Curated annotation (Swiss-Prot):
The keyword RNA-binding does not apply. The gene is groEL1. InterPro entries: Chaperonin_Cpn60_CS (IPR018370), Cpn60/GroEL (IPR001844), Cpn60/GroEL/TCP-1 (IPR002423), GroEL-like_apical_dom_sf (IPR027409), GROEL-like_equatorial_sf (IPR027413), TCP-1-like_intermed_sf (IPR027410). This is Chaperonin GroEL 1. SUPFAM superfamilies: GroEL apical domain-like, GroEL equatorial domain-like, GroEL-intermediate domain like. Forms a cylinder of 14 subunits composed of two heptameric rings stacked back-to-back. Interacts with the co-chaperonin GroES. It comes from Prochlorococcus marinus subsp. pastoris (strain CCMP1986 / NIES-2087 / MED4). It is found in: Cytoplasm.
């Protein structure tokens, strides 16, 4: 594909245009008086969102170089979302102002490299001050953080606070859609562990990049699976039952993984595969815990159990399993509650007789996972659009609350960033060089989130900043008053602010040091088929793939591709895949 090249100021200006386009759409979503963004969907009703990452992902620009800028700032939002679960709009706002200030100084003759060094030096100062101002969160603060992150919605704050109180920080909280109009909290058995899907092709929700299995059957084994030959009998039985299927094994690789993906994508079997958590002997213990939770039999090599002898009675079950790229959450049925409690009591006895502190810690971790349970927040709404909106707000609020528990909180509303900006300004050397200018870029950027919060609430951002500095109090955008934001319960998770700063400086520094941008030139869309083309003519079909022992993929022969008449590909009939074919 031909490439478009852009150099020097031209490339940076085009990148900045893309960054500004995305940032201007995103920054209306910050603060308690934030505005919504409506996103058209190809199918179904439009989405109404107030989440920076979601908005940024939807924007594509005609100019290839500007679109690179749009994708770079979208990367900032996505990375912050992935790491902290919140703070995407703050990260976007910071990136935009840093890029604007950086490019303005470069146009005036500043050295990009020295600016970058100054920005990184300023960032280190800010992070050190941020850590010193952070305070540990207590029970009453959880509701405050959740409420602020939910845009001031006290109902969301209350339900998250209640869920946290019941399952504790070791438990699991999941958010799902409800059939009723009310948002409810339900506590059930379950656990999560740090292993994700073995292949991204198992994803069922492309937007959230997760795999969800409703009422699945579960095979649990400590064996490595590299071929599905031994699993054909049980796979056929599961297919007949029309249930989703999860394979939890020491490893799933090679031909076995390829064949599962093929069957998943062809609609033959709704399946996913996950590697077992932990390592060595602890891996088997973890699998035993999961087997008890789900009512499964652990198919173990130690007991000479063979995969080809597995029956439906050996499989476990769950209400729902959610798998991301690095985490699996199991929502179990309550009928295993007594068995789980017995297991917990047994583990507690092991703790008492174990001498190794390390082993005690590991056993206590298992107890916490089993006993913590799962809190289900069931989101109710009158319409599908409202449902999606509320669910996204609750997920953001939940992520922010977890981040607050991890690293503590600071004064919200951008107040802490303003304080640090003043401290950074006061520490500035009275010299004029490019490195110092880079520090100044950070100093000024720290004011921008509060300016935008004020603007979204209908106030002049510059006036609000001046009043905050004069009064020594924070700005409460809910009521337009200047207050002690800690006492008002307006708190931000330290982790969210830290990651927003780190991610924004990282991308902004890369952009201002960019000299050349290379992008694909979009090819013009050709008319379907072309003159005289047979619309149904096409590539000779792929002949039917060999049967899969009852689970065969339907043959694909004869499915011509429109517009490519006369270019037949030789059939591939009879090429059965090994194992289940």
């Amino acid at each position: 594909m031909p490439k478009q090249l852009s150099f020097s100021n031209e490339s940076r200006e085009a990148l900045e245009k893309g960054i500004n386009t995305v940032a201007n759409a995103v920054k209306v979503t910050i603060g308690p008086k934030a505005k919504n963004v409506v996103i058209e969907r190809k199918f179904g009703s439009p989405d109404i969102v107030r989440d920076g990452s979601t908005v940024a992902k939807e924007i594509n620009l005609d100019n290839p170089i500007s679109n690179l800028g749009a994708k770079l700032i979208e990367q900032v939002a996505s990375k912050t979302k992935e790491s902290a679960g919140d703070g995407t709009t703050t990260a976007t706002i910071l990136t935009q102002i840093m890029v604007q200030e950086g490019l303005k100084n470069i146009a005036a003759g500043a050295s990009p490299i020295e600016l970058k060094k100054g920005m990184e030096k300023g960032l280190n100062f800010v992070l050190e001050k941020l850590r010193s101002k952070s305070i540990k969160i207590n029970g009453s603060d959880i509701k405050k953080v959740a409420t602020v992150s939910a845009g001031g919605d006290e109902d969301i704050g209350s339900i998250i606070s209640k869920a946290m109180d019941i399952v504790t920080s070791d438990g699991v909280i999941t958010v799902e859609e409800s059939q009723s109009l009310e948002t409810e909290l339900d506590i059930t058995e379950g656990m999560s562990f740090d292993r994700g899907y073995s292949s991204p092709y198992f994803v069922t929700d492309q937007e959230r990049q997760i795999c969800e299995l409703e009422n699945p059957k579960i095979l649990i084994t400590d064996q490595k699976i590299s071929t599905l030959t031994n699993l054909v009998p049980i796979l056929e039985e599961v297919q007949k039952s029309a249930s989703p299927f999860l394979i939890l094994a020491e490893d799933i690789e090679g031909e076995a993984l390829t064949t599962l993906v093929l069957n998943k994508n062809s609609g033959v079997l709704n399946v996913s595969a996950v590697r077992a958590p932990s390592f060595g002997e602890r891996r088997k213990a973890a699998l035993e815990d999961i087997a008890i939770l789900t009512g499964a039999k652990l198919i173990s090599e130690d007991q000479s159990m063979k995969l080809e002898e597995v029956t439906l009675n050996d499989l476990g079950k769950a209400k729902k399993i959610t798998i991301s790229k690095d985490k699996t959450t199991i929502v179990a049925f309550d009928d295993t509650k007594d068995l789980v409690q017995e297991r917990v009591e047994k583990l507690k006895r092991e703790v008492e007789i174990t001498e190794s502190e390390y082993d005690k810690d590991k056993i206590n971790e298992r107890i916490a996972k089993l006993a913590g349970g799962v809190a289900l927040i069931k989101v109710g709404a009158a319409t599908e659009t409202e449902m999606k909106y509320k669910k996204l707000r609750i997920e953001d609020s939940l992520n922010a609350t977890k981040a607050a528990i991890e690293e503590g909180v600071v004064s919200g509303g951008g107040q802490t960033l303003i304080e640090i900006s003043n401290e950074l300004s006061n520490s500035r050397k009275e010299i004029s060089d490019d490195l110092t200018t880079g520090i100044d870029i950070i100093t000024n950027a720290l004011l921008e989130p509060t300016k935008q919060i004020a603007k979204n609430a209908g106030f002049n951002g510059d006036v609000v900043i001046a009043d905050i500095k004069r009064l020594g109090k924070g700005f409460n955008a809910n009521n337009g008053e200047y207050e002690n934001l800690n006492e008002s319960g307006i708190l931000d998770p330290t982790k969210v602010i830290r990651l927003a700063l780190q991610d924004s400086v990282s991308i902004a520094a890369m952009i201002i040091t960019t000299e050349v941008a290379v992008a694909d030139i979009p090819e013009p869309e050709a008319a379907p088929g072309g003159p005289g083309a047979d619309p149904m003519g096409g590539m000779g079909g792929m002949g039917g793939m060999g049967g899969m022992g009852g689970m065969g993929m339907p043959g694909m022969g004869g499915m011509g591709m429109p517009g490519m008449g006369g270019m037949g590909m030789p059939g591939m009939g009879g090429m059965g895949m090994p194992g289940m074919m």
